[in-house]
Amino acid sequence: MSILAEKLSSILKRYDELTALLSSAEVISDIKKLTELSKEQSSIEEISIASKEYLSVLEGIKENKELLEDKELSELAKEELKILEIQKSELETAIKQLLIPKDPNDDKNIYLELRAGTGGDEAGIFVGDLFKAYCRYADLKKWKVEIVSSSENSVGGYKEIIALIKGKGVYSRLKFEAGTHRVQRVPETESQGRIHTSAITVAIMPEVDDVEVSINPSDLKIEVFRAGGHGGQCVNTTDSAVRITHLPTNISVSMQDEKSQHKNKDKALKILKARLYEKQIEEQQLANAKDRKEQVGSGDRSERIRTYNYPQNRLSEHRINLTLYSLEEIMLSGSLDEVINPLIAHAQSQFE
């Protein structure tokens, strides 16, 4: 038996063990254990199905090779072997992809955070434009988008947008969006036709629960204040806005979108946990990078990952030297898979 076949046999054995355990009274009565084992089985279900098919093909190849000695059946066996060898090759390719270590956060929902950087009003306008592109992409994927917080500027753009995106595989597809996105275009207010360069930062933070990120209440500084509108005018006569600071890391989150102080506090705490978890991920990625051939970006917000050049209708993905001359179509239709699929393929190739 080949090394691959042995590995697949052990995966199938574990899958069967989990099936038996999940039907046992002891596990059924233990919610934590039941959830843990269910997640493990779900994580190897796809590779288990492919493994069964692959081992069946190997058995078919073995049987047909034996039939080559039979004069009456040799021609039929030859034809069958051709088909089986093709199936074997296709399955091996698929299985290699399935065996790539899976990011434990890939199935999580995310908090998407876009912030205007250098470039003034134009950066704020691009925050809105890129957010719309992400919303269109989410529609294509049947994901749900909920704006958690937004801060508009005076020209119809945004200083910041934070949104919760829910759906299947959200983090797995959007995690490579983290970093600095640079835009080059002629602003509508530019009379001389000069191209302006501005930048925004994107953060992708997995939604986490209390088990994954535990915060000591004594590490939090919670402040309340009155919510302000455009130009600093007061829009609320009560102290409904909330700012929570995690003292050990100095990470701070402010929330004032809700009229209720309790709701603002709840939202701020969830985003704070997501930011702390994101920080853990960044630290882990830096540690793992030493053992990797290369990284598709560190996820660091300061890393310039992509340029959107409107005069040339060009999108340049700097991490994999990808250039596409269909920028406007991608932004208007939300067809970000043209960029995301090559990024995922490149990341997977680093494990081969």
From Swiss-Prot:
What InterPro entries does this protein map onto?
A: PCRF, Pep_chain_release_fac_I, Pep_chain_release_fac_I_sf, Prokaryotic/Mito_RF, RF-1
Q: Keyword Ribosomal protein: yes or no? A: no
| One term of GO molecular function | translation release factor activity, codon specific
Where found?
Cytoplasm
Q: Does the keyword Protein biosynthesis apply?
A: yes
Disulfide pairings:
none
Q: Name one Pfam family in it.
A: RF-1
Q: Name one GO cellular component term.
A: cytoplasm
Spell out the residue ranges making up region: Disordered: 288-309
Which keywords appear in this protein's UniProt record, sorted alphabetically?
Answer: Cytoplasm, Methylation, Protein biosynthesis
The Basic and acidic residues compositionally biased stretches are 289-306
* Record PTM: Methylated by PrmC. Methylation increases the termination efficiency of RF1.
The record's function comment reads: Peptide chain release factor 1 directs the termination of translation in response to the peptide chain termination codons UAG and UAA.
What does the similarity note say?
A: Belongs to the prokaryotic/mitochondrial release factor family.
**HAMAP family linked to this entry:** Rel_fac_1
Protein name per its UniProtKB record: Peptide chain release factor 1
Q: Say which species the protein is native to.
A: Helicobacter pylori (strain P12)
Q: What is the lineage of its organism?
A: Bacteria, Pseudomonadati, Campylobacterota, Epsilonproteobacteria, Campylobacterales
